[in-house]
């Protein structure tokens, strides 16, 4: 009787936990709202000194953030779609002089943030056309090893479910 009562109590908790795992699943890109905070994050990253080697000497400034996508990994990847200028040195937002001497273009700026290690790094800067073509055929590189495949996502959910069941079995 006691065991069946424990199962009745644990089952709804497991069902709710499964929904949480599904909603917050790592690995896939999701549209996000452009906010003042994430726009400040973009400015801080572009004006900083932490750029991946793959970025090389490429620098951009932005006049507008047109859209944003995020990806949860061992931290957060941000994919900013911006209207901006190709520059030699960036302070984030385009200055008046930069805007007067360039033609605005679309760029995709990818940033990795890991708040608990104070990591903020620009990992990729591409022209919008090139970025659109490459992101549709090749998954974006991530600092942590994650997979966007369905089987990997299902495996992650299964592992979480098994861990949760093991946790609840201690109470039975």
UniProtKB/Swiss-Prot annotation:
Keywords recorded for this protein, A-Z: Protease inhibitor, Secreted, Signal, Thiol protease inhibitor, Virulence
Compartments, record wording: Secreted
Site (Reactive site): 27
Low complexity bias: start-end ranges: 130-156
GO cellular component, one term: extracellular region
GO molecular function: cysteine-type endopeptidase inhibitor activity; peptidase inhibitor activity
Record's compositionally biased regions (Polar residues): 157-166
Top-level division of the source organism's lineage: Eukaryota
Chain spans, region Disordered: 129-172
The keyword Signal appears for this protein: yes
Residues in the signal sequence: 1-17
Function of the molecule: Secreted effector that interacts with and inhibits host apoplastic pathogenesis-related papain-like cysteine proteases. Inhibition of host proteases by a pathogen extracellular protease inhibitor forms a specific type of defense-counterdefense mechanism between plants and microbial pathogens.
Family: Belongs to the cystatin family.
Name the record gives this protein: Cystatin-like cysteine protease inhibitor EPIC4
Species classification: Eukaryota, Sar, Stramenopiles, Oomycota, Peronosporales
Designated gene of the protein: EPIC4
